[in-house]
Design a protein with these regions (language model features):
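C-terminal structural segment of proteins
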Residues: 1-172
Length: 172
């Protein structure tokens, strides 16, 4: 692993400022993909900006006809949340099958969406449910967000804050 500086963000604005100040930096939340990439020297960063304690990235909230899920919500939290289970049962089921218990306990919705691994389940779910990715700078419909394998419309200094799903009239 190459040397890097670790920065724990105290807020979303500070995290964005640090990403702009250090162009070779990367945000870190669950770290399920980034940390192994760093360990195996497949990626190199100047700074890691830790987002794991940011309250702005947490929470699951019904907002009218949509459900907003914070980017920092762990897979196991999405899977076990009563609101997700009742409004988007397939998404709850999907989240409960991601990886293994350790991955579900650490990995986050935002990290999986930002990484856009073709083997991941969340990107397909966002596309199928016409979700909107909410960043600290704008809102992007899923169809415009995912550009290709491991590629998204995110700018280097842009952070996913939440994902908004329209609640379907019917769900199975």
């Amino acid at each position: 692993m190459h040397a890097f500086e670790y920065l724990r963000a105290g807020g979303l604005k500070q995290a964005g400022d640090w990403l702009r100040q250090h162009p070779e930096s990367r945000p870190l939340s669950g770290g399920m993909t980034l940390v192994p990439s760093l360990k195996h020297r497949l990626a190199q960063v100047s700074h890691l900006v830790d987002l794991s304690r940011l309250g702005e990235l947490r929470g699951i909230e019904r907002q009218g006809s949509s459900l907003r899920i914070g980017a920092g919500m762990r897979h196991e939290e999405v899977a076990s949340d009563p609101q997700v289970q009742s409004t988007l049962p397939a998404l709850a089921h999907l989240a409960g099958l991601i990886g293994d218990p350790q991955v579900r306990a650490r990995g986050t919705l935002g990290g999986s969406v930002a990484n856009n691994d073709p083997a991941a389940d969340y990107p397909a779910a966002l596309l199928a449910l016409d979700a909107v990715v909410i960043t600290d700078q704008r809102e992007i419909v899923a169809a415009d967000f995912f550009l290709g394998m491991f590629s998204t419309a995110l700018q280097p200094d842009e952070l996913i804050v939440a994902v908004r799903f329209q609640v379907p009239r019917r769900a199975a």
